[in-house]
Amino acid sequence: MISTSSRKAKGRRLQNKVRDLILEKFNLHPDDVRSAIMGESGEDIKLSNSARSKFPFSVECKAQEKLNIWDSLKQAEDNSNSHTPILIFKRNRSKTYVTLSLEDFLDLL
C-alpha cells in the first residue's frame, strides 16, 4: 500500500509536468503558471491572466492507479469557475491522458 506522502508526491510530479509543458508550449513566464500546493483548494494548475488567455482551461490532475473518473470529472467541473474543465490523468508506466466533455472537444475543432 502506498503511503500518503508517496501518493502526494506522485500527484505533485504530474502537476509539475503539466505546468512545465504549458510553460514551454505557450512560451510563458514561470510566474504565469504554478502548480497548486497539495491540499490547496481549487484548480491544480494556477494561471495568470496572461496564461489564461493562451490556455483557457481549468486543470485537475490525477496520478492514480484506480481512478474514479466520474468523481474526478465532477471535481474538475466544480473547480472550473467559468473556464473549460479538463482532467489530466495517468497511472504508473502509462501515457498521460486528457479528458473533457464532447461539446468542449468539438468547440476546439
Regions found by a protein language model. Give the residues of each.
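Catalytic phosphate/metal-binding cores of nucleic-acid and nucleotide-processing enzymes, i.e., regions
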Residues: 1-109
